[in-house]
Amino acid sequence: MAEPQLLLNYIGHLPECPTWSAEEHALYWADILEGEIHRYHLPTAEHTVLSFHEEVGCFALREQGGFIVAMRTGIWLTDKHGLLRRKVCDNPSNPQLARFNDGGTDSLGRFYAGTFWGPGDYNGALLMRIDNDLTPKVIQCDIHGHNGLAFSPDNQWMFTSDTPNGVIYRTPLDEQGEPGRREVFRQFKEGEGIPDGAAMDVEGCYWSALFDGWRIARFSPQGEQLEEYRMPVRCPTMVCFGGDDMKTLFITTTRENMDADEVAKYPLSGGIFILPVNVAGMKKSRFIER
């Protein structure tokens, strides 16, 4: 079985939201706490960084170029240079207590972004969707920390995780992609790690980065663990599929909340890893505006 390898000579603070661009042969990701979007062009190893004025929770590439970016206080459209062009909406949570976190697009090119509640043990976060006409809509509440967004290949299910509560949910979707009542897909026990960012493969299996769990796990459509890949760091944060055949897994990791001793012992924490796998991942749509 292949093992994860470091992709490039870079160590971040809280890398998340890895996003593959097949057209560019490039990997994008955010460093949330640094307020950055990174781009790494695999053929040339060129690494560039866009800096923003506040934390960047998640983003998606736009069909017409540039990004849709969920920052702490709101969601913006930018050009390809990261210049803010239009504010889509404010953060519907209290931005002093909850920042935007994980997100992405569905097959219809709509953008989703969830928040992460900061202080205390309180489910004050939510998940919202930006439709193609830029209308914002809150679609789920009662969340402590949103993560793990992915969609089944048949578009009948939306998957999310609530990281602090250690649970992955799945939510049925109707023909228009509107959500029904969510249900528990998998609950994690103490010591297993907690579900962070995720991706979906073409067989309908859900790949989850298990924060504090030292591993990436693949789950069947019924929630059974099928495979796991051990990581050389404690806290993987998210995965995405890419490469020419979509059989390369890119993995972000973090060194947030690690003391100096742990960082010295596991110096690759915060790195970006690459892992060849035997199944192709689902391709992600760009954000489509109409």
Regions picked out by a protein language model, each given a short descriptive name:
Residues T171-E178, V277-M282:
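Short loop/turn segments immediately following beta-strands, especially the blade-tip
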Residues C240-R290:
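Blade-level signature of beta-propeller repeat domains, shared across WD40, Kelch, NHL, RCC1
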Residues L42, E63-G65, K80-H81, D90, ...:
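Flexible "stalk/tail and boundary" regions
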Residues Y10-E24, H53-M71, N94-R110, I139-W157, ...:
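Beta-rich, blade/repeat-based domains predominating
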Residues E36-H38, G74-W76, A125-M128, V167-Y169, ...:
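A short loop-to-beta-strand structural motif that recurs across blades of beta-propeller domains
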Residues L83-I139:
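Hydrophobic alpha-helical segments and helix pairs
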Residues A22, L27-I32, I68-T73, F111-D121, ...:
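Conserved beta-strand positions in repeat-built beta-propeller and related beta-rich domains
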Residues E3-N9, A45-S51, R86-S93, T135-C141, ...:
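A short beta-strand motif characteristic of beta-propeller blades
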